[in-house]
Curated annotation (Swiss-Prot):
This is MAP kinase phosphatase with leucine-rich repeats protein 2. Probable phosphatase with dual specificity toward Ser/Thr and Tyr-containing proteins. One of its GO terms (cellular component) is cytoplasm. Belongs to the protein-tyrosine phosphatase family. Non-receptor class dual specificity subfamily. It holds the Pfam family LRR_1. Keywords: Hydrolase, Leucine-rich repeat, Protein phosphatase, Repeat. It comes from Dictyostelium discoideum (Social amoeba). The keyword DNA-binding does not apply. The gene is mpl2. It catalyses: O-phospho-L-tyrosyl-[protein] + H2O = L-tyrosyl-[protein] + phosphate; O-phospho-L-seryl-[protein] + H2O = L-seryl-[protein] + phosphate; O-phospho-L-threonyl-[protein] + H2O = L-threonyl-[protein] + phosphate.
Length: 695
């Protein structure tokens, strides 16, 4: 059938509507109906000419030998015949040849209904993208493409998972966004090479069980998943680094999510999560980016401070009332927040910091407090190492018979409590008692040991404080020395005939310089732990993670007229703000799935932001919906950016409700939201709507 289409298209001078020849579109579906015809008549001649020129520019001739072909938005019904050139002639299709060169074929946003078997004439095809077409199934012969690794078939018409995909064993990346898939077959486990899977915007009710074992990136956003419990996530936790569960219906984070120890990016946007369990969050040691916007969270667990790799955390649209109170109402100056500001349990923060400070005791070290000769105990500044070594260090601390300490001059009395040989009174000989000792004597011994342990703990904290100060001072001096060495190098380059007095000091090898620079970068990226002494003589720990970004102030829509808001898609995500401002209706002028159908009433107008799109036909329906929303509470109108489609819908309502002309409605709308910019096609339709209103 495919060959007949090609032969027919290449021999007839008058081709069927929508046919393709040499990669150029020769005609397509026209708008039908009275509304569409009126709209076409309203377009100016110059606009039509511009559209034809744009269409010609979009067409791309395939150059023989090219490895990539783009044919997006071409209204193709089939794969262009021009691609099958340059190689051995096919026996099945005599007019076509094998193309060994083509490796990437991208035909998104066309009208392809099926994948023809002649695609097997592209044996080295590595990337096939047929997104936004009209596919309903995947043929079995596609598995003959042994080099195919990336397959993109999102935004098609699949009502169930295409089983033949499970036979393409070479796949490493599969994209099936925006279909109607409800589950995954067991055969899907056969794709052992699959690393990147996107099932965004489908109808999954739960996290699928049949996830291949080596998945690294998993996108399950915008489904109907209500439970975060999943055995499959535990099974793939060894490889999983990116997980997207945003725009679902998750209310609780199951303890099984503690398995995500290798995940670096976790997205939980737009769910119904109220609490983040500390035991779960504290397990995400590798986490770099954590997205939690537009949930119902009012408090972060203190364990978040232990995530030493965390650099970005998004908390927008949540219920952090304490942080809201800190913002001055009359100042536009941005306020800087620390992660501790979002944690209510401050005592737990300090406890965690103390518990995760690493003390490494040394042995056989003699301290002379008179001449200030002492040995500095080496510790690590990374929280990761602190946590990993904590238990071992605690055990060493109890077993070691000697310890090195550094004391201030005002702590000499405490120093006297340690004997001259620094022997701790914790050995069996120090507290050897007879079997007939009384119970009272045992209690006294226990108290004595406890006092000794408390004294040691105080000394350790003092030691750590001084040690950190010394390390900071040493770090500064090293930086000074490094800068001095660099200046000397520059100076010697300017005076090539003069020899440096100390060649070892000034002539640093290039490899050594790189190592020093890398070491400095690593030091900057590591968390810094400092101890400070408060006025109450209580030692406090401050843990600072440099370069950490916290997002929590979300974008809100603009009020155009009473009870009518205009904004972008993010504004429609902010359920807390919407509920606080009594919004009951949401008009979405784009192809977006309702996020909170249980909280708000939605009207979805599926229309693209292009000049040719017919928004005029939806004015009546949209105006009635906006009217209803304003009567019951308030209405938000949004598209993707809140600039063109939603702005046009807003102006149409203002024109209808107040009997205003287009320019008057435009002035009102742009005053409330200065960034609006409707496309020329929408403007022409609004002007036509004006004529209809004033007939």
């Amino acid at each position: 059938m495919f060959l007949k289409k090609l032969l027919k298209g290449s021999s007839n001078s008058t081709r069927p509507r929508g046919a393709t020849f040499n990669g150029i579109y020769t005609g397509g579906d026209n708008l039908s109906g009275s509304s569409e015809q009126n709209y076409n008549n309203s377009l100016t001649t110059s606009t039509k000419q511009t559209n034809r020129q744009t269409l010609l520019l979009k067409s791309m001739e395939y150059i023989n030998g090219s490895s990539t072909y783009y044919g997006n938005y071409m209204d193709y019904f089939d794969i262009p015949v021009q691609l099958f050139v340059g190689g051995e002639q096919s026996e099945i299709y005599p007019m076509l040849s094998y193309n060994q060169s083509l490796k990437s074929l991208i035909l998104d946003f066309n009208k392809i209904t099926e994948i023809p078997d002649c695609i097997t004439l592209l044996p080295n095809l590595n990337h096939l993208s047929l997104a936004a077409n009209q596919l309903t199934h995947v043929p079995e012969f596609l598995s003959q493409l042994k080099s195919l690794e990336t397959f993109e078939i999102g935004i098609n018409q699949f009502t169930c998972f295409p089983l033949n995909v499970c036979k393409i064993k070479s796949l490493t990346s599969l994209h099936l966004e925006t279909n109607n898939i409800k589950s995954l077959p067991e055969e899907f486990l056969n794709l052992v090479n699959l690393k990147d899977l996107s099932l965004f915007d489908n109808q999954l009710k739960e996290i699928p069980d049949s996830l291949p074992n080596n998945i690294e990136k998993l996108n399950l956003g915008c489904n109907d998943i209500s439970s975060s419990k999943s055995d499959s996530l535990i099974r793939i936790s060894h490889s999983l680094t990116t997980l997207n569960l945003s725009e679902n219906k998750i209310e609780e984070l199951d303890e099984s999510l503690s398995c995500l120890v290798n995940v670096k990016t976790l997205m939980l946007d737009c769910n119904m999560i109220k609490v983040i369990p500390g035991s779960v969050l504290g397990s995400w040691k590798s986490l770099v980016t954590l997205n939690l916007p537009h949930n119902l969270i009012s408090d972060l667990p203190p364990e978040v401070i232990l995530l030493s790799n965390l650099r970005i955390i998004d908390l927008r649209g949540n219920n952090f009332e304490n942080c809201k109170k800190l913002i001055p109402t009359e100042s536009s100056t941005p306020i800087s927040f620390k992660i501790e500001d979002f944690i209510q349990n401050k005592e737990r923060i300090n406890s965690l910091k103390f518990d995760n400070i690493e003390i490494l005791p040394t042995t056989n070290s003699i301290i002379n407090s008179n001449n200030n000769n002492y040995e500095v105990i080496t510790t690590t500044a990374t929280t990761k190492n602190i946590i990993e070594n904590k238990e071992d260090n605690d055990e060493k601390l109890l077993n070691n018979s000697t310890i090195s300490i550094v004391l201030d001059s005002n702590n000499k009395s405490e120093n006297n409590e340690i004997n001259e040989n620094n022997q701790l009174l914790t050995t069996d000989d120090d507290y050897n008692t007879d079997k007939n000792d009384s119970f009272t004597e045992s209690e006294d011994i226990i108290k004595k040991i406890q006092i000794e342990l408390d004294s040691i703990e105080i000394q350790q904290k003092q030691l750590l404080l001084k040690q950190i100060k010394l390390k900071e001072k040493m770090k500064k001096e090293k930086n000074k020395l490094f800068k001095f060495q660099q200046q000397e190098i520059i100076h010697q380059e300017q005076l090539p005939q003069s020899k440096p007095e100390n060649e070892k000091l000034t002539n640093i090898p290039e490899q050594q310089q790189k190592q020093q620079q890398q070491q400095q970068q690593q030091e900057v990226q590591q968390p810094i732990i400092t101890l400070t002494k408060s006025t109450s003589s209580k030692v406090e720990v401050e843990m600072i993670v440099p370069n950490q970004l916290i997002f929590w102030q979300s974008i809100v829509p603009d009020l155009i007229i009473d009870k009518l808001y205009l904004g972008c898609r993010e504004c429609a995500m902010n359920k807390s703000w919407l509920k606080d401002n009594n919004v009951t209706h949401i008009l979405t002028v784009a192809n977006f799935k309702p996020l909170y159908p249980d909280l708000f009433k939605y009207l979805i107008i599926n229309i693209e932001d292009v000049d040719e799109a017919n928004i005029y036909q939806h004015f009546k329906e949209m105006n009635a919906f906006i009217d209803e929303g304003r009567e019951k509470g308030g209405v938000l109108i949004h598209c993707r950016a809140g600039v063109s489609r939603s702005a046009s819908a807003t102006m149409a309502f203002i024109m209808m409700k107040n009997s205003l002309k287009f320019q008057e409605a435009f002035d009102i709308t742009i005053k409330g939201r200065p960034r609006i910019y409707p496309n020329i096609g929408f403007i022409n339709q609004l002007k036509k709507f004006e004529k209809d209103l004033f007939k």
